[in-house]
Curated annotation (Swiss-Prot):
This is Uncharacterized protein MG294. To E.coli YihN. It comes from the Bacteria. Gene3D superfamilies: MFS general substrate transporter like domains (1.20.1250.20). InterPro entries: MFS (IPR011701), MFS_trans_sf (IPR036259), Sugar_transport-like (IPR052528). CDD domains: MFS. One of its GO terms (molecular function) is transmembrane transporter activity.
Length: 474
């Protein structure tokens, strides 16, 4: 299913203006900093709970809170994006997320002077507010703006440039600082032994960068004009409601949403729990785990995003490309789970090496999924002016695991936590990974159904490509 493109990479890159490339780089930056503290830091910093002064299952609990808020705000976010300037929504998101991150930093700085319950309650509120600022006014506007920087033929390449920029920003500002903190200030004796100042400074840096990137989006990223009226009328309300109803009636869009959910576990729960398993079950050195986490989360995204997106653009179907990535990812994670049956009471170099390689390979596939997942929309009929609503539904279903799945993993983790420890056991990690693997398999089945249906459709219509429709992303 791979076809040769008419243009080489350099010629296709020239299709982008300097303004568009700059915009994609800026969008990569704001993507890093808005998502970093709520989601990605725990995938880079092993045993994040020690720095926060809480337990591992409580980290899963606060993550589930942001997931539930995401569920409540994802679809309204699509409505807002259809109605208001995406650029201004991103600016508002960056400023408010930055303010909340300042609050987080202050709590980390004073955690030894606060009770455990007081800290945990504040973290619950912080993660809940992040759910609003990183979803309602951020997620759909981000991808709508990124999509507008490229033609329909270069959609994947455009997302690849944004993803590569994301990786570079994250590598410098998230990973390298985290590496310094974990290699020098890791609280090996428990959270009470941690020096709170370095990690608090880390949070302050993220907050400051959020404010800076917010203003760069406002002044340097262009967007297509949207149809507006001077005031909200009954007619415009009915039109927007109709767009949402059309989206909700699209069965293929629902199945692709479940497919995205299956892919998302590789980016979220696998990225977190397999890293924790490396640290706490396989007893890998904390610096090694931080390096692997940073490479997977940021360096790989920068290194492979453009290449994988070029490969996806050459493929007749983005859905097929994502199916291949998912199948390989399932195989690698299954192998990781099986390695957990190797009994060890001390660090096993062979075990750590193989599991680290599997973790990296899974990360490569994950970023292939991330950068192409919204390109699926171009292979189904979504109707006119429904792009943002379609992204909203995909994200609503796809990222719902941040809510209900982390609630499940928190309970499993708590049940299998050995008395006197703050993290779960090897068996707990295996059970959590197996649950996530079943979700990935379900998503793969859903994606396969849409691909088969599309194959029958293009055969009936005598089309040469799965991407024969015009992409309406205004």
């Amino acid at each position: 299913m791979i076809v040769t493109t008419k243009k080489g990479f350099k010629k296709r890159l020239k299709d982008f203006s300097k303004q568009q490339i700059l915009a994609l780089i800026i969008l990569g930056a704001i993507d890093v900093f808005v998502i970093a503290a709520p989601y990605y830091v725990k995938n880079v910093v092993p045993n994040l709970h020690l720095y926060l002064g809480i337990t591992e299952d409580e980290v899963a609990t606060v993550t589930s809170i942001i997931g539930y808020v995401t569920l409540a705000t994802q679809l309204p976010g699509g409505f807002l994006t259809n109605r208001f300037s995406s650029r201004k929504l991103l600016f508002l998101s960056a400023i408010t997320t930055g303010a909340i991150t300042f609050w987080l930093a202050a709590n980390i700085l004073t955690k030894n002077q606060q009770s455990h319950d007081a800290l945990f309650i504040q973290y619950c509120v912080i993660w809940g507010l992040w759910g609003i600022t990183s979803t309602l006014i951020f997620w759909t506007p981000l991808w709508k703006l990124a999509s507008q920087q490229a033609t329909k033929e270069n959609q994947a390449l455009g997302f690849g440039i944004q993803g590569a920029a994301n990786g570079i920003w994250g590598l410098i500002f998230i990973f390298l600082i985290a590496l310094i903190i974990t290699s020098i200030f890791y609280p090996s004796g428990g959270s009470e032994n941690a020096d709170s100042k370095p990690f608090a400074a880390y949070a302050f840096i993220i907050a400051i960068m959020l404010v800076i990137t917010g203003f760069t989006v406002l002044f340097f990223v262009k967007e297509k004009p949207i149809e507006k009226q001077s005031q909200t009328t009954l007619v415009s309300f009915k039109r927007n409601l109709n767009q949402i109803l059309v989206t909700l009636k699209n069965w293929k869009l629902w199945l692709l949403s479940f497919f995205l959910m299956g892919m998302y576990v590789f980016q979220s729960t696998f990225a977190y729990y397999l890293l924790q398993m490396l640290q706490n079950a396989f007893l890998a050195p904390v610096v090694l785990v931080t390096v692997i986490g940073g490479i997977r989360t940021y360096a790989l995204r920068s290194a492979v995003s453009v290449y994988l997106c070029r490969l996806a653009d050459k493929c007749k179907s983005y859905i097929l490309f994502l199916m291949i990535c998912t199948v390989l990812g399932i195989v690698f994670v299954l192998a990781f789970i099986l390695l957990g049956f190797v009994q060890t009471n001390s660090a096993n170099i062979t075990l750590i090496t193989f599991s680290s390689i599997l973790y990296i390979f899974t990360g490569i596939l994950s970023w292939g999924m991330v950068t192409v997942r919204y390109n699926q929309i171009g292979e189904i009929d979504i109707g006119k002016n429904n792009y943002a609503s379609s992204v909203g539904l995909l994200s609503f279903i796809g990222f719902s695991t941040d809510g209900w799945l982390y609630t499940v993993t928190a309970e499993v983790g708590k049940k299998y936590t050995v008395a006197g420890q703050s993290n779960t056991s090897n068996t707990g990690y295996q059970i959590i990974a197996a649950i996530c693997l079943s979700i990935a398999l379900f998503g793969l089945i859903c994606g396969s159904i849409v691909f088969i249906s599309n194959s029958m459709e293009i055969k009936r219509l005598n089309k040469a490509s799965y991407r024969w429709r015009d992409l309406d992303n205004a």
